């Protein structure tokens, strides 16, 4: 292979690795992070709209917390970071009734944030992590199948970021 072709192959491999790093990924800690092509404000609005489209299935947006706005009140500067509390009370409420301490971790949250390079991201806990780690630590009973909930989370996050 010529030097030029090796260089092109190396460049192609480097680009593929970089592109893979920019796509959605789930860390070992259950956190799923997806890049957004929108601003923080638009990603928040799109995620909340996606959750509201699932109202018939029981999903709702409870509130949002704008960390940057709160920091500004105290003279602190931070890049945009907004937490959205959302969930499905049909699923979460029975768990909270039966195991009150699970409420410290419910409702689920999504974080929309901007990194130092200006890239916007949406992060949330996977359904598997929520039910098999968080519920487990409280001794709460988890649903038998997490895949359908994971699919809904994936759809909502894709709608917000793509």
Predicted features and spans:
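C-terminal partner/receptor-binding element of secreted or periplasmic proteins
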Residues: 127-162
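Terminal, regulation- and interaction-focused segments at domain boundaries
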Residues: 25-58, 162
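Short beta-strand element of the conserved SAM-dependent methyltransferase core
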Residues: 33-34, 84-87, 112
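Beta-strand/loop substructures that line and gate deep hydrophobic ligand-binding cavities in soluble
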Residues: 109-139
